[in-house]
């Protein structure tokens, strides 16, 4: 002991190395307040560094107690050395402030005698000399408590130089209480406590009794002080330590911890420099012991030092290693501990409560962290879920003791899965912020979802994070330190703060992950509400799928005001809970949550959320879509983690409210795009339809007002998120979803979008007065003030919408005017009967009319950017809004805006390209837009495509420009797509022919963004068969219109070329005249389908894969372009299709989403980006998210459905053509992949597109060879599309389809569908393009598709459903079915891509059961899914068909399918295969 003490006091102190914390101690140079009591020699070092004024005296003085090394290190800063534990109060006792604090008097007597003979270390003379009052002006700073039990005798007399010092007389027994700075020690002599030069005393053997005299508290303090060398400033060092060592065996249960929190020095390797002292015998000690816990019962107490763990010496072992050793022991732990009993002074007791260890928070990061985490969580209101998980990980390993807390809270954990101790804190912590609340719930993994959503099937979602929560619980309990006594707790308070500090780091990181990606952190900052709202957009992406379930609810409960109110309020209130847990995961929960409060607003929000793992959850969603609302909590909690792991896009999505940021381009799209994106993007947008800040002008109704407010709030939040890349990727999807659910709001949004679009993009669209405008207005009214507001731009939006509509519907205006109430005047192309204005077909026709007019009037005139944005927005949103029920419009708008934003984004990134694309797009838009009349936002897609496919655009533009540009202005419709769409639009709008035209549009273009639920099928193939099917149903035409939108030129470049091929080959000669009408008839008869498919699917699909710009332009002019340059169009189309397939397969829906986005315009764009680059494709990402889960699945079904729409009017001729075209398209599509590639490279989404392109190319190589195969797929696609898209499906299943297809809503029957419709639309788009390549469609589907081609006209009415079912062979077999029918289709869609993709190729695998597939079949299948990149791994691992059904996520990851989208695509495709 003496030697230790000597070493301590001598220059060669046990702690020679400067402690890691020295710097810190040095820092407070002149502050006596926080001396590190435990600083020993090392601390001397510190002492110098942070010497108080008095300590500054002389280096010599300060050096007295410093080791030579220390002196060298801090020769001039003696203060550090004299740090005293507490503040020093002058006076006998006050001389040693720390003593006073500790109860120095009591120790005084005890410690007076122990003196250290420090004389040798410091020259008394020097010290004395150096000690001048000035030098030591005030109380010395106590560096650390002296080792208890040492006795010192004064060898030199000393007279106090400064107040607080004590006189020493030779021979006096001095009890050294603490080591201070400047060579001064604090001690008691003759009843006086104060400072004296260390040189004046020498150590003598101390009496054991003295050591023992000190209470354990004193010893602990001393030990801790020594150990921490200044870590524990607040503890006085008791002179005496009673050391008792004992070996205890701890046996705990699995669900509990050992009940102690371990703290200690952190070191990767044993700290050999550490010299155990009686006061600090080991590096690791028990910071806290849960009362009643395992450790407590075994006799362990706070402050015990760990000597051995499982019979291994850990005296010098670092914290992490010790924790790992404890963990390795499992539930059995043998600990040898040393209890250093410190003398307890009254002060000490207080101090003792929070033993120095707690104070050591900085030193012991892990243990400390757990507490600190807890404290921080509480303080910060951060979600404990993340922290808990982190903590659990850390603490569990670090300290099994903490586990004990869990054990104590083990019951709680079992009950709540939450630690009792932490439970409260986390709860309070969580509750403060939405994220916090979510965290708490997440932690619990129970209450959150349930409370959040009354009928919450979201429990499961919470369940996801439950494990995490539990962990957190343990951590929480640990944090709470249930075992800690009240006294200790007090002590813990400071540690808690420190812990908070420590925790904050872990917490933040932990928290952030759970809040998918970085969202949780961001959202919380905004505000629970904000966070929730934005979150909701993210969920909205999920919502895309959700909509299917919520369509009806959404419709009913979409009052804009209510919605926004609900969204904002609910989001804030419930969002907090769900957001984290369910946000990501449970589309349903969010829906439920939203529904109750404001079905629409909530829906939107949910939708955004839903996309998180669209693909993975597609199946789920399909079934749970109905009660999706049950999972409000999902908002953030569960998916957060999942998304990170699985769905970066989705995660982004969940978090993505920021994704909405991606939609930011909506700004450029002004009101409209903003609307569309806003809806998804901003709470306001989400809430109010498209109530972006600009759109928030929905003054007309309370709904509008409420939404406006909500939107603004959300906008702010979203703005905040926009800045976060993660959010960006999700934004589109969310937005889309958000728009979809509240049809009214969406419509408002739509209108504003359209209006905004018109204003911004098509200032020349003052055609508001046109009948088109009137219908829009009607829609606005329909929506109520909300819609008008959403249109927003106050009255402007409405007129804007009309305007946008007007220009677009210039020629179509008459048609429109006939249907101010809706596209009611439009005649069904097939049946010749008047279409319901809200019917998808009518909407599509209206959109097409608008597009035609627009193209005639001023597509060219529109600024490139405006044009892009506007067509996307207007066509997609505007037309669909007017034509389809408001819900459809809403959804379409949503999609449109997404698309449009995407377009804008592209614009900004690829201005040059965009402009060129714009020209092209103008042509395309004129064609497609005319055809679509901005139906269901396909135009939007178009527009988006143009900007997106900058390079492709150039590529295609050159071709298409040659081809399309001529048609562009005179008759965009004449183009392959325009023919179908443009001509059809004009025709359909004015007369029955129009309806067919529309149908054709749907069939040919499947461009009805809204109707897109049918997925603008793969351009040629899907188009052919699906077109027929689509023709069968009324709603098909609208989808066709969307098909126009489908024409997303850039994306269409490839897709349209395929369509063009179809059109060219098929309708090629029918008439791709510039005149819309002539084009339309041709389309309706022959090329309608091809055009529709090409335009819709190819464009839609291609755009996402490539640049949307190029594709979009090509897509719109696709028919013409295709005719002249089928190749180009096909390339786009192929890309689109492949992309969509690829996306589905590779990106789990991102790509698909991209396709889907294209249908909507935005949705399509969104889809694409998510797969490759979330940020890049923000819009797409947003959509992507929505599409991810819902869209993708829906997309398949919808996609399938969509192709049929293209051929509805001219099913017979068109289908035959389509079949041909499909093949060419397929070949071209596949063949054009390279071309597509270029487009893909262009634009902000170049990365995503490139990736998609590569996938497409791979797919193309395999599929292009087999046009038949492509046809095959299209058949499936067509079928799928047909069902959703068929008029009956559209109208009947409007809601249904909505669910499945985003645009289903547009067809308009149900507003709820709008929400879901949108995503489905996107999906359908994606699906369509997928279908075009028809990789997924099974041979049966292929046959079907091909077969239907000839009989489309007759089949149109009857076949749609059957085709869908047959084609899909997926869950969605009822085309006309209900939401679910569509949703199933949509859900199926999710698998559908798989099916589509499977059949896409003529490879053998398409003809045999999965379990009989050989390795090459599996490779071919992957290729068909655009996942050829994984072929080699699958082959290398000898994965054959028998393995596929058993592949788990982990297996896929092991096989290199790390992308959530790819994995989801594979899973979905597998599900489809197995369901077939």
UniProtKB/Swiss-Prot annotation:
Enumerate composition-biased segments (Polar residues): 66-76, 1070-1085, 1307-1317, 1364-1375
The Low complexity compositionally biased stretches are 666-678, 833-846, 1131-1151, 1291-1305, 1387-1401
Motif SH3-binding mapped to chain: 1169-1175
Q: Which parts of the sequence carry Phosphothreonine?
A: 485, 903
Where can this protein be found?
Answer: Apical cell membrane; Cytoplasm; Synapse; Postsynaptic density
Instruction: Give residue spans, biased composition: Gly residues.
Output: 783-795
Renumbered to this chain, the Pro residues biased-composition regions fall at: 512-528, 1202-1212
Tell me any Pfam family this protein matches. Answer: SH3_2
Keywords, alphabetical: Cell membrane, Cell projection, Cytoplasm, Glycoprotein, Membrane, Phosphoprotein, SH3 domain, SH3-binding, Synapse
Indicate the segments annotated as coiled coil, or none if absent: none
Instruction: Please state the span of the N-terminal signal peptide per the UniProt entry.
Output: none
Which stretches does the entry tag as region Disordered? 66-134, 391-412, 503-533, 659-916, 946-983, 1057-1153, 1195-1216, 1260-1403
Segments crossing the lipid bilayer: none
Q: Where is the SH3 domain?
A: 147-206
Q: Tissue range of expression?
A: Detected in brain (at protein level), where it is highly expressed in Purkinje cells.
Residues in SAM domain copies: 1413-1476
Q: Which residues are glycosylated?
A: 1292
- Disulfide bridge map: none
Q: GO CC annotations?
A: apical plasma membrane; brush border membrane; ciliary membrane; dendritic spine; growth cone; neurofilament; neuron projection; neuronal cell body
**Oligomeric and partner information:** Is part of a complex with DLG4/PSD-95 and DLGAP1/GKAP. Interacts with CTTN/cortactin SH3 domain, DLGAP1/GKAP and alpha-latrotoxin receptor 1. Interacts with DNM2, DBNL, GRID2, BAIAP2, SLC9A3, PLCB3 and CFTR. Interacts (via proline-rich region) with PDE4D. Interacts with ABI1 (via SH3 domain).
Q: What is known of its domains?
A: The PDZ domain is required for interaction with GRID2, PLCB3, SLC9A3 and CFTR.
Functional note: Seems to be an adapter protein in the postsynaptic density (PSD) of excitatory synapses that interconnects receptors of the postsynaptic membrane including NMDA-type and metabotropic glutamate receptors, and the actin-based cytoskeleton. May play a role in the structural and functional organization of the dendritic spine and synaptic junction.
Q: What is this protein called?
A: SH3 and multiple ankyrin repeat domains protein 2
**Species of the source:** Mus musculus
Report which gene this protein is encoded by. Answer: Shank2
């Amino acid at each position: 002991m003496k030697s230790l003490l000597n070493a301590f006091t001598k220059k060669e102190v046990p702690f020679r190395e400067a402690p890691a914390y020295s710097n810190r101690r040095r820092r407070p140079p002149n502050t006596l307040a926080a001396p590190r009591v435990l600083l020993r020699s090392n601390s001397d070092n510190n002492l110098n560094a942070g010497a108080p004024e008095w300590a500054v005296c002389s280096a010599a003085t300060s050096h007295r107690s410093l080791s030579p090394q220390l002196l060298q290190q801090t020769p001039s800063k003696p203060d550090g050395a004299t740090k005293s534990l507490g503040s020093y109060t002058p006076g006998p006792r006050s001389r040693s402030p720390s003593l006073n604090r500790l109860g120095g008097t009591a120790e005084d007597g005890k410690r007076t005698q122990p003196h250290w003979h420090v004389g040798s270390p410091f020259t008394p003379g020097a010290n004395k000399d150096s000690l001048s009052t000035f030098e030591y002006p005030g109380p010395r700073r106590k560096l650390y408590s002296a080792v208890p039990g040492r006795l010192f005798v004064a060898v030199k007399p000393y007279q106090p130089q400064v107040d607080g010092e004590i006189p020493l007389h030779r021979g006096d027994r001095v009890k050294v209480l603490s080591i201070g700075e400047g060579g001064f020690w604090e001690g008691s002599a003759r009843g006086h406590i104060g400072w004296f030069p260390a040189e004046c005393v020498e150590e003598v053997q101390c009496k054991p009794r003295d050591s023992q005299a000190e209470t354990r508290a004193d010893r602990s303090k001393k030990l801790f002080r020594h150990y921490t060398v200044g870590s524990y400033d607040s503890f006085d060092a008791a002179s005496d330590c009673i050391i008792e060592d004992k070996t205890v065996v701890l046996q705990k249960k699995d669900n509990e911890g050992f009940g102690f929190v371990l703290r200690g020095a952190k070191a990767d390797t044993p700290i050999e420099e550490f010299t155990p002292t009686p006061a600090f015998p080991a590096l690791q000690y028990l910071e806290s012991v849960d009362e009643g816990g395992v450790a407590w019962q075994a006799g362990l107490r706070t402050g015990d030092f760990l000597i051995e763990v499982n019979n291994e010496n850990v005296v010098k072992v670092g914290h992490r290693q010790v924790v790992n050793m404890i963990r390795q022991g499992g539930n059995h732990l043998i600990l040898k501990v040393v209890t250093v009993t410190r003398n307890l002074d009254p002060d000490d007791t207080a101090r003792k409560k929070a033993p120095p260890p707690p104070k050591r928070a900085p030193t012991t990061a892990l243990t400390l962290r757990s507490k600190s985490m807890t404290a921080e969580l509480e303080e910060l209101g951060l979600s404990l879920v993340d922290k808990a998980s982190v903590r659990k990980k850390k603490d569990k390993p670090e300290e099994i003791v903490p586990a004990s807390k869990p054990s104590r809270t083990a019951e709680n954990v079992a009950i709540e899965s939450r630690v009792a101790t932490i439970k409260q804190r986390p709860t309070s912590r969580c509750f403060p912020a939405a994220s916090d609340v979510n965290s708490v719930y997440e932690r619990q993994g129970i209450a959150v979802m349930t409370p959040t959503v009354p009928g919450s099937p979201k429990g499961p979602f919470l369940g996801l994070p439950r494990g995490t929560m539990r962990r957190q619980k343990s951590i929480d309990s640990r944090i709470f330190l249930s075992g800690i006594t009240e006294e200790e707790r007090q002590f813990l308070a400071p540690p808690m703060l420190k812990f908070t500090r420590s925790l904050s780091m872990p917490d933040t990181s932990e928290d952030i992950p759970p809040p998918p990606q970085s969202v949780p952190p961001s959202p919380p900052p905004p505000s629970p509400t904000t966070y929730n709202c934005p979150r909701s957009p993210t969920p909205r992406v999920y919502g895309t799928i959700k909509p299917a379930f919520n369509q009806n609810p959404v419709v009913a409960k979409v009052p804009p005001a209510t919605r926004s109110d609900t969204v904002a309020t609910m989001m804030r209130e419930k969002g907090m809970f769900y957001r984290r847990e369910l946000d990501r995961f449970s589309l349903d929960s969010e829906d439920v949550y939203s529904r109750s409060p404001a079905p629409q607003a909530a829906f939107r929000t949910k939708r955004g959320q839903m996309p998180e793992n669209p693909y993975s959850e597609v199946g789920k969603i399909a079934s749970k879509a109905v009660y999706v609302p049950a999972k409000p909590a999902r908002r953030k909690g569960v998916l957060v983690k999942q998304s990170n792991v699985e769905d970066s896009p989705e995660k982004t999505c969940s978090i993505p409210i920021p994704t909405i940021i991606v939609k930011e381009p909506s700004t450029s799209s002004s009101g409209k795009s903003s609307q569309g994106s806003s809806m998804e993007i901003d709470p306001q947008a989400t809430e109010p339809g498209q109530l972006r800040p600009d759109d928030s002008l929905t003054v007309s109704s309370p709904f509008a007002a409420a939404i406006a407010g909500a939107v603004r709030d959300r906008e702010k939040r979203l703005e905040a998120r926009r800045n976060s890349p993660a959010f960006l990727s999700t934004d589109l999807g969310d937005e889309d979803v958000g728009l979809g659910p509240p049809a009214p709001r969406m419509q408002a949004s739509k209108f504003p979008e359209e209006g905004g679009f018109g204003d911004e993009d098509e200032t020349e669209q003052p055609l508001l007065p046109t009948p088109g405008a009137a219908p829009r207005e009607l829609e606005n009214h329909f929506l109520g003030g909300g819609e008008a507001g959403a249109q927003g731009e106050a009255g402007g939006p409405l007129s804007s919408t009309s305007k946008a509509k007007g220009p677009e519907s210039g020629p179509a205006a008459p048609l429109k005017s006939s249907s101010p109430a809706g596209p009611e005047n439009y005649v069904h192309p097939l049946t010749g009967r008047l279409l319901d204005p809200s019917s998808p077909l009518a909407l599509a026709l209206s959109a097409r009319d608008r597009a035609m007019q627009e193209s005639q009037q001023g597509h060219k005139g529109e600024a490139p950017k405006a044009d892009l944005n506007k067509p996307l927005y207007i066509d997609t949103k505007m037309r669909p809004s007017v034509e389809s029920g408001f819900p459809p419009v809403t959804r379409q708008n949503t999609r449109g805006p997404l698309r449009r934003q995407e377009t804008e984004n592209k614009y900004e990134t690829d201005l040059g390209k965009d402009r060129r694309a714009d020209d092209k797009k103008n042509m395309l838009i004129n064609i497609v837009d005319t055809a679509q009349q901005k139906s269901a936002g396909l135009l939007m897609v178009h527009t988006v495509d143009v900007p997106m496919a900058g390079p492709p655009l150039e590529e295609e533009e050159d071709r298409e420009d040659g081809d399309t540009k001529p048609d562009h202005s005179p008759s965009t419709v004449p183009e392959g797509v325009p023919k179908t769409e443009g001509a059809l639009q004009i025709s359909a709008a004015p007369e029955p022919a129009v309806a067919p035209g529309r149908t054709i549009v749907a069939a040919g273009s499947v461009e009805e963004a809204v109707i897109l639920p049918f997925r603008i099928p793969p351009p040629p193939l899907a188009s052919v068969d699906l077109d027929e099917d689509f023709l069968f149903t009324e709603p098909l035409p609208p989808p066709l219109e969307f098909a126009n939108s489908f024409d997303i030129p850039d994306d269409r470049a490839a897709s349209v070329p395929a369509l063009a091929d179809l059109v060219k080959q098929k309708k090629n000669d029918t008439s791709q005249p510039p005149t819309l009408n002539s084009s339309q008839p041709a389309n309706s008869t022959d090329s309608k389908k091809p055009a529709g498919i090409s335009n819709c699917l190819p464009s839609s699909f291609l755009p996402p894969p490539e640049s949307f710009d190029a594709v979009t332009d090509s897509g719109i002019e696709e028919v013409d372009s295709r005719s002249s340059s089928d190749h180009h169009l096909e390339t786009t189309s192929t890309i689109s299709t492949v992309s969509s397939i690829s996306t589905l397969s590779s990106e789990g829906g991102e790509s698909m989403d991209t396709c889907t986005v294209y249908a909507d315009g935005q949705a399509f764009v969104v889809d694409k980006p998510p797969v490759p680059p979330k940020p890049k494709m923000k819009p797409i990402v947003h959509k992507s998210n929505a599409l991810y889960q819902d869209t993708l699945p829906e997309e398949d079904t919808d996609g399938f459905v969509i192709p049929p729409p293209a051929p509805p009017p001219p099913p017979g001729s068109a289908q035959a053509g389509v079949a041909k075209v499909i093949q060419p398209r397929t070949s071209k599509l596949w063949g054009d992949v390279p071309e597509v590639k270029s487009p893909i490279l262009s634009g902000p989404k170049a990365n995503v597109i490139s990736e998609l392109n590569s996938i497409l190319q791979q797919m193309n190589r395999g599929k292009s060879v087999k046009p038949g195969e492509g046809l095959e797929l299209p058949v499936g696609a067509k079928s799928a599309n047909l069902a959703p898209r068929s008029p009956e499906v559209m109208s009947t299943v409007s809601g249904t389809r909505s669910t499945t297809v985003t645009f289903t809503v547009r067809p308009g029957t149900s507003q709820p569908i709008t929400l879901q419709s949108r995503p489905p639309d996107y999906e359908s788009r994606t699906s369509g393009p997928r279908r075009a390549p028809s990789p997924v469609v099974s041979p049966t589907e292929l046959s079907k598709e091909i077969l239907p081609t000839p009989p489309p006209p007759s089949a149109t009415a009857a076949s749609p459903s059957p085709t869908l079912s047959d084609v899909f062979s997926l869950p969605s077999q009822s085309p006309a079915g209900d939401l679910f029918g569509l949703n199933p289709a949509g859900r199926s869609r999710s698998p559908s891509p798989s099916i589509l993709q499977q059949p896409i190729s003529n490879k053998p695998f398409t003809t045999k059961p999965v379990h009989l597939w050989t390795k090459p079949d599996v490779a071919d299948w992957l290729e068909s899914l655009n996942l050829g990149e994984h072929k080699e791994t699958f082959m290398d691992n000898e994965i054959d068909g028998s393995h596929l059904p058993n592949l788990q996520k982990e297996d896929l990851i092991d096989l290199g399918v790390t992308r959530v989208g790819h994995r989801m695509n594979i899973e979905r495709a597998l599900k489809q295969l197995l369901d077939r």
